[in-house]
């Protein structure tokens, strides 16, 4: 068949524009496309929620791609292996309780699982601010193109209305810190004091699930952002806690959606 370059342009512009407009109102906006939010997005979408992931970078997956120090392998504890099974991620036992998976396969299948379930992904779209209403409750997000943010260009953003936001932005806990910076007297965990603690894998893995909660009205925190927001230790290239945190975030969000 003959190809018309203009039709190609129109197809891309038309279809993406329709999707963007359709997702100006969502049930849950997940900020950051790391493993916790990918897990949360899948389970939310499977439950019928309208969800979108906003990732500033070109690719999703957070720090999982590189495994440990660019060795593309990750470790997962036994209690999280059921989530690997759910996504069809292969793994093998290294020692009792320690399971190893290929980091690249893991990210690919997490992304596939989330999108196949119906989660929409907006990569190269950065979070800039939250929308608030009565009592300063979070009711939406403010977004811009990722390159605009990186280059610090003076371009006004656009807004997305959402019932809930999940901060899965990793060590920086970007959404949490934005609220602390811009809403007077806002209280979010221990942010503004110490932030994330140094490495302690065992404790960090335990606390990341405990720290996954609605940390501010309309905002759930998950993954490494949860540890940062609650002054909990980092854990390195062991990802069971990340996966379980995403699962818990989805359950919490579904419970909250029923209340709204």
From Swiss-Prot:
Query: In the record, what terms sit under GO molecular function?
Result: iron ion binding; pentosyltransferase activity
What's the cofactor?
A: Fe(2+)
State whether keyword Cell inner membrane applies: no
Q: Which reaction does it catalyse?
A: hydrogen sulfide + glycine + NAD(+) = ADP-5-ethyl-4-methylthiazole-2-carboxylate + nicotinamide + 3 H2O + H(+)
Protein's job: Involved in the biosynthesis of the thiazole moiety of thiamine. Catalyzes the conversion of NAD and glycine to adenosine diphosphate 5-(2-hydroxyethyl)-4-methylthiazole-2-carboxylate (ADT), an adenylated thiazole intermediate, using free sulfide as a source of sulfur.
Q: Does the keyword Metal-binding apply?
A: yes
Instruction: Name the protein family.
Output: Belongs to the THI4 family.
Q: Which GO terms describe its biological process?
A: thiamine biosynthetic process; thiamine diphosphate biosynthetic process; thiazole biosynthetic process
Q: How does it assemble?
A: Homooctamer; tetramer of dimers.
Q: Which gene encodes it?
A: thi4
Q: Where does Fe cation bind?
A: 156, 171
Q: Where are the transmembrane segments?
A: none
Residues that bind NAD(+)? 36, 55-56, 63, 154-156, 224
- Write down the Pfam families for this protein, in alphabetical order: Thi4 (PF01946)
What name does this protein carry?
Answer: Thiamine thiazole synthase
Give UniProt keywords alphabetically: Iron, Metal-binding, NAD, Thiamine biosynthesis, Transferase
Question: What pathway is this protein a component of?
Answer: Cofactor biosynthesis; thiamine diphosphate biosynthesis
Q: Which residues form a coiled coil?
A: none
Q: Where is the signal peptide?
A: none
User: Which InterPro entries does the UniProt record give?
Assistant: FAD/NAD-bd_sf (IPR036188), Thi4_fam (IPR002922), Thi4_prok (IPR022828)
Give the EC number(s) listed in the UniProt record: 2.4.2.59
Residues that hold glycine according to the record: 234
Name the Gene3D superfamilies on file: FAD/NAD(P)-binding domain
């Amino acid at each position: 068949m003959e190809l018309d370059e203009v039709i190609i342009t129109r197809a891309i512009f038309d279809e993406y524009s329709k999707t963007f407009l359709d997702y100006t109102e969502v049930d849950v906006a997940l900020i950051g496309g790391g493993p916790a939010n990918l897990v949360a997005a899948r389970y939310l979408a499977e439950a019928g929620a309208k969800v979108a992931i906003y990732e500033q970078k070109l690719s999703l997956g957070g720090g999982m791609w590189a495994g440990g120090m660019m060795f593309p392998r990750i470790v997962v504890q036994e209690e999280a292996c059921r989530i690997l099974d759910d996504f069809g991620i292969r793994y093998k036992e290294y020692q009792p309780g320690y399971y190893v998976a290929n980091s690249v396969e893991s990210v690919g299948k997490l992304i596939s699982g989330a999108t196949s379930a119906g989660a929409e992904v907006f990569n190269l779209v950065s979070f800039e601010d939250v929308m608030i209403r009565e009592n300063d409750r979070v009711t939406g997000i403010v977004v811009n193109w990722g390159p605009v943010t990186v280059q610090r260009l003076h371009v006004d953003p656009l807004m997305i209305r959402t019932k809930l936001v999940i901060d899965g932005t990793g060590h920086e806990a970007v959404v949490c810190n934005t609220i602390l910076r811009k809403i007077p007297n806002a209280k979010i965990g221990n942010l503004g004091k110490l932030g994330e603690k140094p490495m302690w894998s065992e404790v960090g893995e335990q606390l990341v699930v405990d720290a996954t909660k609605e940390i501010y009205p309309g905002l759930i925190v998950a993954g490494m952002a949860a540890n940062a927001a609650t002054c909990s230790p980092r854990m390195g290239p062991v990802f069971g806690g990340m996966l379980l945190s995403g699962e818990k975030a989805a359950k919490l969000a579904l419970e909250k959606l029923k209340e709204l």
